[in-house]
Every structure is written in C-alpha cells, then in structure tokens.
Amino acid sequence: MSSVRAQFAEVQEQLNQVHSLVDSNTPSDLNKAATILKSLLPVYKDLSGNEESKRPENLEILKEIKSRLTEETQRVMSKKEEAKSLQIQQQQQQQQLLQQQQQQQILESTTRNRQASQQELPKPPILSGYLKKQGDKGLVRSFKKRWFLQRDTKLFYYEKEGDSEPYGFVNLPEMINVKTVDSGFELATPSRVYVFQVFKPSDLTYWTEGLKEFKKYYQSLQNSQKFGANANGNGNSSPNMSSSGSYSDFRKYSESSQQPLNSSTGAINTTPQRGTPIKDRRGTVSGGTTEYSHSSSSTAPDSPTLSSSYVPPPSSSNLNPQDEELKRRENEIIRKHQEKLKQQDDQQQDDKQQQQQQSQEPPQQQQQQQEQLQSQPSQQQQQQQQQQQQQQQQQQQQQQQQQQQQQQQQQQPPQTSPQNSRHGSTNYSQLQQQQQQPQQQPQQQSSPQVIISNNNSPRFESQQQQNNFHNNGSNINLESFRQSIEDELNKKFLKEKQDLMEFEIKKRLEIESEIKKLQLQLDQTKTDAEEKQNKSSNELKKKKAEIEDYEARVTIITKRNEEMDAKIKELESSRPVETFPHEFLWTEEVNSRDLLIASQSKRILELEEQLKLKDNAVTVIKRENEMLRQETEKKDKYINELLEKGGGSGIHTNSNNNNNSNNNNNNSNNNSNTDKIKESMVAHQTQNAFLLQEIQRLETQSQFKLDIKIQQIEELENQLEQQLYQFHRFREAIIGTMSNEYCVKIEKENLDVKKEYFQSLGVSIKLHRVKEGYFANIDINSLFDKVIKENVHYRNWPEWISNQFNQA
C-alpha cells in the first residue's frame, strides 16, 4: 500500500509541475511538460494494472490522475496549436511588413528622386514687364513697345498692360539660347531669333536670368519624367533636337554649303562660309563671306558685270587647316546623328517584335521584359546626355577657333575710304542678320536662304562695295577701330557700374526695410510683454478676489454644516425603532399581510414535510408487500414439490401391493400428510389474497390522500399569488410604480446631502492648506466616490480628507 501511495504522490507532483509549466506558456516549458506527460503514461499503465490500485480507496485517486492526465495533455496540445498559429501569423505579418517596407522604400526613393530633381532647380518666377520688340517684316525692322506676360510655357506679348488679346507668343520650351546685345538681348528659337531692347539695365538681368532659369527648370522636368513617351517606342530625341526632320534640314543645309557655286543658275546664293570677319551693328563679330552668281544679260541687261570684283570660293586644297577641322567635325556630327537615327529605327523595330512576342508569352516573361524596357530609357538618357556634352564641347571649340580667326583677320584689316566703310558696314550688318538666321536655324531650313536684288538696290551696292572691300586690299584705320572698341568697353564698364550701384542701392534699401521690420517687431514684443504683465496682474487680482469669495463661502458652508450636524443628531435621537413611522395607516395592514404570508409559507413547508413522511411510509408498505409476495411464491413452489413427491410415492405403492403388504400403513400416512398440506396451502392462499386486498386498499387510501394534499397545496399557492398581487397593487397605489421607489428616493436625498457636506469639507480643507502654503491638485468629486466605496463614516471624513491631501 505504501509503495502505491508513494507512486500516486509522485505522479500528482509531476502533474502539478506540468500544470505550472503549461501556465508559463513558453516553448521550452511546453516541451518539458510534453516529455513529463510521455514519461507518466507507462507509470499510469503500471498503476492501473496493479491489484492494490483497484481497491476502492485507490480507485478514486486513479480516476483523478486519469482526468488530470487527459486535461493536461489537452492543454499542452492546445497551447502548441496556439503557438503554431501565432508563429504562422507572425510570419505572415513579417512578410506583410517586409512587403510594405519594400513598397515604402520604393515610393520614398521615387519621391526623393522627384523631390531632388525638383529641389535642384526651384520653380522660376513668372516673367512680366515692358520690352521693345524688333519686327520680323521689312528691310528696316523697327522696335515697338510691347507688354510681355508669361503664362505656363508661353511668353505672350500685348500692345499694353491689361489687354486680353495678344499679338503673339514665344514658345519658351523651344528656346535654344539667350544672348545679351547692346541695350537688350536675343532669344533664339529653331524658327526665329527674337531681338528685344530694355528700358532699364536692371531689366536686362531680370529677363536674361529669368529665361535661363526657366530653361534649366524645363530641362530638369524633362529629365525627371524619365522619357516616358520614349519607353513606348515613340522616339528618343533629345530636348535640343526634337525630331529627325529638323536635323535633316540642318544636314541638307550643311551639304549645300559645301557644294561649289552653280554659275549656270540665275539666282543669288547666300551661303555662310568660314572667312573674313563681319562687324555687326550690335557689337558682335561673326565670320563668313557671301558668294554671288549673277544671271545672264537677258534677265538684267543694265546691270554691270561682277567679273572684276568677284572672288571665287576657295577650293578644298586652298582651305585653312582650321576650316578643314571644322568641316571634318561637322561631318562627324552628321555621321553620328545618322547612326543614332539608324539605332533608333532598329530599336523601334525590335520593340515591335518584342511586343508581338509578349502577346504570345506568359505574363511572367512579359513582366521581365517590361522591367528591361524600363531600364532602357535610363541608358538612352545617359547616351543622349553624353552626346549633348560632346556637341557642346565641339561648339565651344568651334567658337574658340572662330575667335582666333577673327583675331588673325583683325590684325590684317583692309583699307577703304571712311564713307565706303560706313556705308558698307551699315548695309552689310543687315545682310549679316539675314545670314545669321540660317546659321541659328539649321534644323528647319532645307535649303540656304536666297536673296534676289536688282542692280540699282542699295543692298546690291553694299555687296559690290563689300567685294571691293575684300579685293582691293585696303586697310581700316586701326586707331578708329581701337577707339570704337574702347568706347564700347567704356560703355560696358559704365553699364556694369550702374548695375552695381543699383544693386547696392537695392541691397541697402532691403537692409533698411529689414531693420525697420525688426524694430517694429521689437516694439510689438515690448507691447505684448507689457500687455501680458498687465493681464497677469489683473488675473492675480481676480484670483485673490475669488479666494476671498471662496473663504466667505466656506465660512457660510461650515456654519450650515454645523447646523446640519445638529439637525442630524436631533433626527437620530428622535428616530423610532420601527422601519416605518406610525403616521402612515397602511403600514399596519402591510405588516399584518406580511405575517399572514409568512405563516402560510410555514404551513406549506409543514405540509410538504408530512407528504414526504407519508411517501416514505408508502414505500415501506410496498417493500413489505414485495417481501410477502416473495414468501408466498416460495411456499407455492415448496407445496408443488411436495405434491409431486406424494403422487410419485402413490404410484410406486400401487405397483407393489401384491409383494409388500406391510407398506399399506405408510401410504395411509402419506395421504393424510398430503391432505394437511393441501389444507395449509389453501389457508396460505386465502391469507395471501387477504393481504393483497389490504395492500390494494392501503395504496388507494394513500393515493387518495396524496391527491387531496396536492389539491390543498395548489389552492394555497393560488391564495399566496393572489395575496402577493394584492399586496403589490396596494403598495404601488400608495408608494409608486416600483416597490423600492420610496426607499430609493430617500437614499438619493441622503447621498445628495452627504455629497454637499463632503464638498464643503474638501473645499474648506483645501483653502486652509493654501493659506498655509501647501498646494495640491485633487478632484473632490473623485474623493467622494472613493469615500463611498471604502464605506467611511461621515464623522471620520475630515481626518480621511486631510490624510488624502497629505499623501498627494
């Protein structure tokens, strides 16, 4: 026994350990609990197979152990399932978080790139103001005053400020370059060169810098958009060269400039060549010569021939090495652009083939190809940027070479008369303006500009003078040329000085305005501080007055509390012992009915007890009847056995009458015994029948009594319900709809009185402590709720409130 009990104790201790491990709800503890349960299973099998454990004392312990084993195994399994589900949820959440983080990183990177691209060049201001615009029609192009206003990417110009209908506009995205000239600036586009003059020198910087900022901003926007249209196969043109057609025009123009002069045609071809410098009326110097081919005598009979003054174009063998290098570079640029166009065409064809394949390929391969296509525009952008940089470097080199040529040519200038030089320079400057337009517009002109003039025109005379200017070999006066350059430089220096003075004046005015603003801010801060001081002093005065009012109220409340305490004491002394006062007449009736209800409930309990006793007696009688029936059955069986034995013995005697005469006496005795047994059997049967009748009579009597008692109980219950209903109706008529409403009203009134008393006590104690210099921010209403929860007596409230303030 001791060994089995010890095993039971060990198993229970291990089960307690398993319970504690499962409660800890950690994976290591759950694994330990599972191992312990596995080790307990064979122990439980051994205990259940042991005979000592099958005893009634140990069976209950075994059942408890079995139930606990099942419970703990179920708990361990449930905890493991919960842990697995939590791990799965955590993994899913981690995956979702990783996906969200990746998406956020992608979005942040895109937003950063966009913000960086937008923050590199802030949005330029809107340009507006009056300018003088040069006309585009007629030989003498005059300047007219116009009001310019920028709207989005277009610069509209009106007759005056406030007009609604513009004369025209300049498309700013097509702007190639902005260059300053005398008292103005030039704005070059592929279709035209706009010349503007400024009223003030400050306006010059305003317009030039504003236009340059807009150009930078527009280029940055184009780069930030990542050439979305090019990714779809619509072309990869750079911002400077918008289409292949514009560059093809430039190619045709360059090829026509390289061809020799066609003498058979009757038109006059003006093709710019690298040659002698020409001084423009705006102060700029550009290189170039004009080539003329006059028609036959049938077209112009009165015109003189140009054989004496005409200089043929230099052949390729007589060209300077600088000109050869320039032409070679131009040819290289054209060749590169042609190769680029071929690459673009090949790429477009490849893109079309890829799109056809994508329609047949699965969606995964389509996604991969889309990613590759998205990566292609960035590579194309890099290639275009590199090509643009190369072109810019080549243009800079060309400009440097032109400047060197101009310096060389200025050192050996021809000499002519001052009148011819002036007249030629004025007329030749107009011709140079017409020649500069095809140079600045090589992308949209498919053939060089053609000018047809008569012999008597001043333009033709200026051209003759210019040819004489080149052929006679006359020299310009160096001193006049130097003086003109010095005058121009002095003018520029004066303009720069004026600009600097205006800039300094603006800065001084801005600084003075800022100083005034700071002084105003200081004055405002001083006034605000004074106002705050006045407000704080007024608030302090108001608070002092409020404290005095509170003190007066506290004194009044304390007096009222003292009076209330006295009244409460009087009421407590005069309060009767009974639950309700004697003034109400209905209280006696209520009490009497309550007594009746209590007495009837007691009577019902007594009747139920009597019924239980009678039920027990009936069960006892039934048991006795069953015992009697069993005895009668046994007696009947015994009698039947005896009868069977007596009949057998009679047959045996009849067969042996002849042999044994001495057995006659025995037979007679046996017959007498059978008769007695029959009589006794009949007596028993009659007795049994009588007993059965009595049992039936008793059962009917008990059943009748039970029915009577059940009827009595039902009647009493009905009477109780009626009396309770009448009682509640009576109380509702006197007190109200609810039976507890009167008591609830009294309790509410008591709570209101207690709350007012508690608030007055709290305010008085708080003000007293404030006077002494102890401040505490405590809500008195919350303290009242706490007092009611703790069931503190109202006489102990002052001490309790002071303790709460001390704790705070």
Swiss-Prot record:
Identification of the protein by name: PH domain-containing protein DDB_G0275795
Name the Gene3D superfamilies for this protein: Pleckstrin-homology domain (PH domain)/Phosphotyrosine-binding domain (PTB)
Query: PROSITE patterns recorded for this chain?
Result: PH_DOMAIN
Residue spans with biased composition (Basic and acidic residues)? Answer: 339-353, 525-542
Keywords assigned by UniProt, alphabetized = Coiled coil
**Regions of compositional bias (Low complexity) in chain numbering:** 228-248, 293-321, 354-375, 405-414, 429-449, 654-673
What biological processes does GO assign it? endosome organization; protein localization to phagocytic vesicle; receptor recycling; regulation of phagosome maturation; retrograde transport, endosome to Golgi
Which residue ranges does the record assign to the PH domain?
A: 124-216
Q: Does the keyword Coiled coil apply?
A: yes
According to the UniProt entry, the coiled-coil residues are 57-121, 322-412, 487-645, 678-734
Give one Pfam family.
Answer: PH_3
Region Disordered: what ranges? 108-127, 228-325, 339-375, 405-475, 523-542, 645-675
Q: Which GO terms describe its molecular function?
A: phosphatidylinositol-3,4-bisphosphate binding
